[in-house]
C-alpha cells in the first residue's frame, strides 16, 4: 500500500481504504481465520520469487565464471539446482493456502452479503421504490452483478495484491542484501513502474462506473419488453422497442471506446520497464568494471528491482478492482444502512394489550412522494367503529386505496393522524401493527413457490390443519385438492399458473390465516367471475364477522350489507351512512352511483356489482383452467412426467462449444480494426523474445574482461532496450483501442440481435420457467459483457501469445537446440497445470451461475411484490427461501476452493522445478563444452520469459472458460427457430381487413402444459363488423380464443382463418397491425403517457393522439395532470390508478384504428363511474368493427350483436341477449344472468 499512499497523498488514500473495508463487512470469525491463513499463503507465495532470484544469481555466477574445473563446477550448479527444488516444495504449500482459503471465504462472504442486501431491500418503505430509485432491474443487478464483483475481488484480486506486495518487499530486500549501490540508484525507477498503473486505475474506475450506470437504461427497456411480450407483439412494437434499445446502447459503446484507449495508454506505459533495464544495464556494467561485482549478481539485482517494481505495479493494478468492489459493496451497504422513514424492522413503539379495531383518520393531509404537487387528501376525516364494516366507494383516483396504504403505513401522512383504538399508529410497533391487519388487494401477489408456502405467508408457524381451514374459509380448498400436487403445486412466477379467481382465493386464505383484527379488502373480488365471486364473497362475509373491515369496491352490490358506506370524491368523504339511508336521498352521490350501475333492463340493482368482478377472472379464467394445472403440470411434469425435464434436455446438451469463427463473423464489419489490432498484437508478441535475447546477451557481456568491449556492447544493448520501450508504447495503444472497438460494437450487436431474436419467439417460449424476464435480462446483461472481454482482451492476448511463443521457440532452437528442446519439452507441464485448473473452474462456473439465476429470480419477485411482503411482514420468510436457493452454490464453492488451491499450488511449484532442471542440464552441457555461457543465458532468458507469457495467458483461460459458456448461450438464443414466425416475408400483408374470423375444428392445449386440453374440435365464426361477446365460467376458454386470434399460440389441429385465409398464411406483424387488444391488466411501459398511447404506431399527429384519448375518455384526466401528456408513467405504470391505466390502454388500441378489436375484460377493473365512461368509449369504438368481447359482467355485453356462451371449451348457446333470455330457465345464459342478479336480490332481503 505504501507506494500507493505516497503517490496519491494520504488524504486521498484514506477514503479508498476505508471504503474498501466495506468489502469485508460481511466476514465472521471463520472467515477471519481463513483470511489470515490465506494472507500467510499469499505472502509466502510472493516471497518465493525473490528467493528464486537469489539462488539464480549464484548459479549465473558459477556458469559465467566458466567451467575451469569441471567437477567442482558441476557440484556447485547441482547444489543450487537442489535448493530450487526445496523452494518449489515450500511454494506449493503457500500457494495452496492462498488459493483455497480465499476462494472459500469469498463465497461465504458474498452469499452472506446477498442475503443481507435482500433483507435490506425488503425492509425499505414503499416510497423508496416509488421514487424510481430502486426499479426491479437495479435490485437484480445488485444481487447478481455487485455480489459477483465482490466475490471475484475476494477470491482473486486480494490474494493477488498481497502476493505482489510481498514480492515487492522481498525483491528489494534481496537487492539491498546483494548489491545496495545498484538497488539504491534504481529505487526511484519504482515510481515510474507504478504511476502508469495507478493513473490507469483511476481513469478506468470512473469509466467503469459510467458504463455500468449507462447499461441500466437499456436493461430496463429489455426487462419491460420481455415481461410484457404479449403487449409488445399485439401492438407490433418490436421495432419501436429495438430502436429505443439501440439508442440506449449507443452511449455505452462510446464510453467503451474511451476505455479501450485508456487501457492502451496504460498497458503501453509499461514499456517503461525496458527503459529502466537500459539504465540498470549501463550502471551495472560500471559496477562490474570498477567495483568488481560479479555479473550474475548484477543481473539478479537488476531483475529483482524490475520484478519488485512490476509486482508493486500489478499489485496496485488490483486497486482498480478494489475500487469497483468497494463501490459495489458501498452500493449494497448504502441500502443495508438506509433506515427507511417507516422502518418495518424497528422494534420501538408500543403494542396494545387488546385491540378492538377502531380506526380513525383525523385531518389527514397526504400526497404521494412521487407526485408531491398533486395532494390526495387535504383534510381527510373518517371513523370506522370497532367490529364494523365500512365500505369506501367513489370514482377512480378519489383516494380509496390511499386510505388502505396509510393504514398499513406504506406511507405516513404529511399532517394529521391515523389512529387505531385511539392511538396514533406511528407510536405503535410496526410489525405488530401490520400483524393486526389482513390485506387482500386487487392484483394478488403470489410468489414462485408452492401454494402452501404462499398461504403460510400469513402466519409462519401455522399447522397444516390451520392452512387447510384457511383455504376452506377462502373457498380455495376444493380447487387446490383437485390439483395433481395439491397444496404443493408450484404457483409459477408472479402466480402465472393460476387463474385470477384462484390467485385471489389463495390471497384471501393467506389473509384469513393471519386472523387479523382489521381486514382490508381492496377490490378483493373484482377479479372473479360470478360463481367464484359469490363463494369468495361469502368467505369474506364470514371472515369479516366481528372484525373491523374496510372494503373498497366498485361493484356496489357487494357492499350493501356494509354497516357504513363512505362515498369519496377527490379525497373527501362526501356522504356517510348505511345503504338504505344513502339510497333514500335521490340526489345524493351514492344513489346516482347505484343508478349508474343498474342493468339496462333495470332488472335489479347492480348486477354489475356482482358481476363486475367476475369479470376479471374471465380473462384469467381461460388461462385459468388451462393455467390451473399449469402449475401443477409444470412441476409434475418436471418431476414425474419429465416433460419439462425433457425440454431442458433437448436444450441443454445442444449447447455445443460455439466456433470462435462464428463470433468473429459477427465482428466482420470491424475488419479494419481487427487487422490493425491483430498486427499490433503480433508485433507486441515479438517484443518479449527480442528483449529476452538482448537481456541474455547482456549477462555474458558482464563476464568479459576487456573494458572497451564491455562499454561498446553495453551501449548497443541499452539503445535496443530504449527502442523497445517506445515501440511497446505505440503498439499497445493500437492494439487495445482497436480490440476495444471490436468488443464494444460486438457487445452492442449481440445485445441487439439477442433482443430482436427473443422478440420473435412465440409466447409459449416466455411461458417456460427458465425464460422468466429476470433470467433473460441478466443473460442480456452478463453474457454480452463476457463476450466483449472475450474478443476485446482475450483475443488480443491469444494472438500476442502465439506470436511470442513461435518467435521464442525458433530463436531458442537456433541458438542452442539441445537446451531449447529440454526447456520446450517441460513447458507443457506448466501449461497442463493451468489447463487443469481452467477445466475445473469451467465446470464450476456453470453450476454457480445457474444457482445465481435462481436467487436473482427470487429477488426480482420479492421486489415486485414488495407491498404484499410488507403488509404480511414476511421478509423473514422470503429470506429463508433465498437462503435455500443459496445452498447449491455453497456446496459447489467448497469443491471449487479445493481445486483452486491444488491448481495454484501445483502450477507455482512446477515452475520453480523446471528452472532447477534447466540449470542442471545447462550446466552439464557447458561442462561438456556443447554450449557457451552466452548461449545458455540467451536461450534461458528467451524461453523462461516466454514461459511466463504462456503462464499469464493460461491464467486468462479461466475467463475463456466463462466466455465459452456465455458465447454458447448467446448462440443458443440466436439459433433458436421460433415456432411462430412473426415476420414471414412470403406471408400475405393485408392493406385492410373486413375482419371475418373463422375458427374451425381446433384442438388446443397450452404448450407449457400439453396434458390439459382446452379445446377439442372447437368451431366458432365471428361475423365481420359485428360485435361478438364470449361469456362463460372461468376456464371455459374465452381468453384462449383471443390468444388464437392474435396468434400468440397455434392450435394443435384445425385452423383459424381471418377473411377466409388461414392465419398462418399472413405475415403476422402485418396482420397484428389490424388487430387491437385491450386486456384486463393493462401493460403500460416506463415512459410518458404520450409515448404509451403512440406505442407501436410510429407516426401519429398530436391531434390524432388527443382524439384517441378523448374517445377513450382519458383526455380530461390527462389534461388535469401537471405535465399533461408528458406525465411519466413509472415502471409498469405504477403512478396511475387502474381506471386511468385502462383508459390509456384503450386509447392506445383506438389510435391503431384496428379492423378487429379484442376486449379481454377491458372494464373489469374499473369502478362504476370510470366503467360507465369507458364502456361508452368502447361502444363508440366498436361501431363498424369486428369486436370480440370477453366479459363477466353481463350487463356490459347486452348490446352485442351475438353472444356466445362457452362451457369447458365448447359453445353451448349463441344468440342475441333477448333471444337467449327468452329461453328461460333451460338456457345457460339465462341462468348466468340470473346468478348475477340473484346476487342482488339476496342482498336486498
Swiss-Prot record:
Question: What ranges does the record give for the region Disordered, renumbered to this chain?
Answer: 610-654
> Keyword Nucleotide-binding on this protein?
yes
* Recorded topology in the membrane: Multi-pass membrane protein
Entries under Pfam families matching the protein: ABC_membrane (PF00664), ABC_tran (PF00005)
Stretches with biased composition (Low complexity): 620-641
Keywords of this entry: ATP-binding, Glycoprotein, Membrane, Nucleotide-binding, Repeat, Transmembrane, Transmembrane helix, Transport
**Compartments where found:** Membrane
**Record has Transport as a keyword:** yes
Family label: Belongs to the ABC transporter superfamily. ABCB family. Multidrug resistance exporter (TC 3.A.1.201) subfamily.
Task: Identify this protein by name.
Answer: Putative multidrug resistance protein
